């Protein structure tokens, strides 16, 4: 298992490398910070700004550091440099606004370039207990059941027993459909050795 301190040092260095004097504010948020807290090496880093002009600065800054745009998504850009993935998202009013729109409290974490931490009141307690508590947002409603399955595979438990019952039913329905669902390899999991 990777040490929390090692990952934190890498994140700290990343923030320092991206920052420059009088630069616009930017922040990391979501799953990468969750993984760092849990001592897991993040598969990617979610990063954004509070305005479109600041986002343009951030993209330009990352490109100047060697990151290249690999794909454009509904949520922003996927950038890569030396096997480090960045999901550069569209701006929000504030880090608090951004994390209030995530799916679960364990993902409701953000840290800005001044190292100020923003989080839901139960984020760290839920992470320590591997408890999955859904936030009441509409942004992820279409994929919430699939995301719950992803977290149960990481040994998270639901805060609400009723949710566990619903998920079991969803797993059964999904299992029946599985043979007809095509497999798509995620670019982040691509391994040249597998060819």
Residue ranges and their predicted role:
Residues 1-195:
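Catalytic cores of the polymerase beta-like nucleotidyltransferase superfamily
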């Amino acid at each position: 298992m990777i040490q929390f301190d090692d990952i934190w040092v890498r994140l700290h260095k990343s923030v320092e490398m991206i920052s420059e004097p009088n630069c616009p504010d930017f922040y990391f948020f979501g799953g990468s910070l969750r993984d760092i807290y849990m001592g897991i090496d993040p598969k990617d880093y979610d990063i954004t700004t509070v305005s479109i002009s600041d986002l343009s600065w951030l993209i330009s800054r990352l490109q100047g550091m060697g990151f290249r745009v690999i794909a454009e998504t509904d949520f922003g850009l996927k950038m890569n440099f030396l096997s480090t993935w960045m999901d550069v998202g569209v701006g929000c009013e504030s880090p608090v606004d951004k994390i209030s729109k995530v799916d679960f409290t364990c993902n409701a974490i953000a840290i800005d370039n001044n190292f100020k931490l923003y989080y839901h009141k139960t984020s760290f307690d839920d992470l320590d207990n591997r408890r999955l508590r859904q936030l009441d947002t509409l942004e992820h409603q279409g994929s919430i059941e699939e995301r719950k399955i992803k977290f149960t595979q990481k040994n998270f438990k639901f805060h609400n027993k009723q949710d566990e019952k619903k998920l079991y039913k969803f797993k059964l329905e999904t299992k029946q459909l599985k043979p007809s669902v095509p497999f798509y390899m995620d670019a982040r999991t691509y391994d040249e050795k597998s060819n």
